[in-house]
Regions:
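Bacterial N-terminal signal peptides
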Residues: 24-38
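Solvent-exposed loop/turn segments at secondary-structure junctions
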Residues: 58-61, 91-94, 137-141, 159, ...
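Glycine-rich, highly charged phosphate/nucleotide-binding loops
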Residues: 94, 100-125
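A glycine-rich, often tryptophan-bearing local segment used as a flexible ligand/cofactor-contacting loop or short
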Residues: 125, 134, 138-206
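Structural recognition of the beta-strand scaffold that forms the well-ordered cores
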Residues: 53-55, 85-87, 130-135, 153, ...
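Extracellular ligand-binding/catalytic regions of CAZymes and related secreted enzymes
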Residues: 45-50, 56, 64-67, 71-80, ...
């Protein structure tokens, strides 16, 4: 019969107690090591959708594609589940604005725009938003406080602009600084092949190295490539094909905020894969419209901080 000494029993108890607290400690340490080395699942994120305001009011030229833009952005929000949308919009052709001559009464339309923006873009209202989208806005919009809006973006909010967002607040340097450029002119609508400058960015990673699209291509002023991260560009004039640098889309940081802009979006068939004109024709295939939708969805999600992307300025076309 084996002999068991009291000291051995004590040692066994001690070892058992040590193991009882050492094992959890080891697990915690290993877990911490995995976190620091990235060998773990993605951290849990707030699953609540972001809140986005789509602004489509205009005091200048009004694009016929605005209703299509509003619809597509709403569909992208619903399909992605990443964000919800509210709208700041006024349709000038609404019967309530009809004047004695049967045309929209400019004073009534302006008053309605002012009222809508006062409600949707007040300092108090902005506090409840994560991003604002300017969908083909034009002219000097009667915001309650334009500078407060820009300051709001700087605090870490998002901004996305499509097409004529650069033809908004013309001659207002703070806004132009925020968005990154200002509309100068455009030629006839034309087919162009855009160079994809960043295939890793969520706004461009689904696009080929050279992407062909038919649209109205803006030429810009007050644009500095050293202050933006280029996404899409042309290396020749869209119409006369002379060599040059013609930016189409970019992202940039603005304070702590994030800004995405694309000059594409003039035509309905750029936005909507199902759209057809009165003759049942379209210049852009459904596939191009679907690619454009992913382009703006990626840009919006980047602006919301939901997708990663390098926003460091580039000094030359890649």
């Amino acid at each position: 019969m084996p002999t068991c000494f009291v000291g051995e029993k004590t040692d066994l108890r001690l070892m058992k107690n040590q193991l009882s607290w050492t094992l959890p400690t080891i697990l915690v340490l290993v877990g911490g090591l995995l976190l620091t080395t990235g060998v773990t699942s993605a951290p849990a994120q707030n699953t609540s959708p972001k809140r986005v305001l789509v602004v489509s009011t205009t005091t200048g030229f009004r694009h016929s594609s605005i209703p299509t833009a509003e619809k597509i952005i709403g569909e992208l929000a619903k399909q992605s589940g990443a964000f919800t949308v509210d709208y700041a919009r006024v349709e000038p052709n609404d019967p309530q604005f009809k004047g004695a001559d049967g045309k929209p009464d400019a004073a009534k339309v302006k008053a309605a725009i002012t009222e809508v923006l006062a409600k949707k873009m007040s300092v108090a209202a902005l506090k409840n938003l994560d991003a604002v989208i300017f969908a083909n806005t034009t002219g000097n919009l009667p915001l309650p406080d334009p500078q407060a809006f820009l300051d709001w973006i700087k605090t870490g909010k998002g901004f996305a602009g499509m097409h004529s967002a650069t033809d908004t607040f013309p001659g207002f340097p703070p806004y132009i600084e925020m968005i990154g450029g200002e509309f100068k002119t455009h030629g006839a609508q034309v087919e162009v092949t855009a160079i994809n400058q960043d295939a890793q960015c969520p706004a461009c990673r689904h696009l080929p190295a050279n992407w062909t699209v038919f649209d109205e291509i803006y030429q810009l002023k007050n644009f500095d490539r050293n202050k933006v991260h280029g996404l899409l560009t042309l290396d020749k004039h869209p119409n006369d094909k002379s060599p040059g640098d013609y930016p189409i889309a970019w992202i940039k940081e603005y304070g702590q905020g994030r800004v995405f802009y694309t000059s594409l979006g003039h035509r309905e068939d750029v936005w909507d894969a199902q759209w057809k004109d009165g003759k049942g024709e379209r210049k852009n295939s459904p596939a191009i419209a679907e690619a454009y939708q992913q382009h703006i969805l990626g840009g919006i999600k980047w602006a919301l901080g939901l997708e990663k992307g390098d926003a460091r300025p580039q000094t030359a076309v890649q």
